[in-house]
Amino acid sequence: MKIRILVLILCALTQGCTYVDDYMLGKDNTPQPKELKEIQPKVKMAQSWTTPVGKAHKTNEYLNIKPAIRGDVIYTADASGLVQAVNRKDGQIKWSTALKNNIVSGPTVAAGYVAVGTNASTLVLLNQSDGKEIWQNKVSAEVLAPPAISHQKVIAKTIDGKVYAIDAVNGKQLWVADHGAPSLVLKASSSPIIVDDLVLVGFSDGKLDALELQTGRLIWQRSIAYGTGASDVERLVDIDSDPIISNNVAYLATYQGYVGALSLSNGQFIWRKPASVYKNMLLSHNNLYFTDSNDVLWSLNSSTGQVNWKQTSLKARGLTAPALVGGNLAVGDKTGYLHILSTQTGELLGRSQLSGGVTVSPSVSGKNMYVLTNNGMLNQLSVS
């Protein structure tokens, strides 16, 4: 079955925001970013260093290429095919590997490996210490979300609804599970999550599968949202936000569907609310934070789903998923601004502008942020 891929920018298509991939051409009705109002800064951001880790690329803003922090090193991937290890203290490059194909997801860094997906429908595994290629493995379609690595296995989900388990040592495919996919999907995707001996995978039809890690056998399946409407676009209910697992509860979100908490003990929803989300959520201190498809930031009580606050002053600015830095929230926007918000109230506490658009959520260690911009620069900023 041919899969059509939809590129979503800034807002729900049902509200007229229509920038799509090459199967659909037409006028771009993307709304103008909401004008920023003057604020009295309550936090300060200072930039320590910046270093090039790739090239400016028109597809950078659509890719799931968030830098990964491990110890004193931050690992980056760029659409041009460049994977690098960068010293967090001074921005110096430790190693650099140029792949033959463009990168569409990653890096995932674990167990001494670095994994990325390419536009040639290949998974590539590198050695974490020196960047040397260990293997490449051809799969059925693009891997648009960073794979998972655990128990010497690399687990990856392809855009056509397959899940692959690959031996990390030799690159051999261990099993493939075929869930399938609708005819139209968003150009976004959630990563597999490994929980004990299960792999939890969200799919483009709004279903969550639990697969046995060793065999790929389907253990159970839950429908998180159901597609409704007359058109393929109206029926989009992709699970593109990574499931968050805490205390035997899965926090889930879908596009044009719901955000909710699902008990892994009995498969029942603890709570569920209508929402449209396709970026990763953040769970911290009994609060669930997320950016919805209209660029409204929300805070919900993770136990009850009750709304703590919402921040609407950044609508249509192309916000990233939120990150936690120094006890506050940080989001980037497509015009290059970083915004700091209070976790308690959603109040805007500060902002800083970088040299390129910020469409990948900041990577954080303590009070330091590492921000990848669409012009291929990695920026280190401290928040105080």
From Swiss-Prot:
Alphabetic keyword roster: Cell outer membrane, Lipoprotein, Membrane, Palmitate, Signal
Localisation: Cell outer membrane
Principal place of residence: membrane
InterPro entries in alphabetical order: BamB, PQQ_b-propeller_rpt, PQQ_rpt_dom, Quinoprotein_ADH-like_sf, WD40/YVTN_repeat-like_dom_sf
Organism lineage string: Bacteria, Pseudomonadati, Pseudomonadota, Gammaproteobacteria, Legionellales
Biological function: Part of the outer membrane protein assembly complex, which is involved in assembly and insertion of beta-barrel proteins into the outer membrane.
Name of the protein described by the UniProt record: Outer membrane protein assembly factor BamB
Record family assignment: Belongs to the BamB family.
Listed PROSITE patterns: PROKAR_LIPOPROTEIN
Subunit structure, as described in the record: Part of the Bam complex.
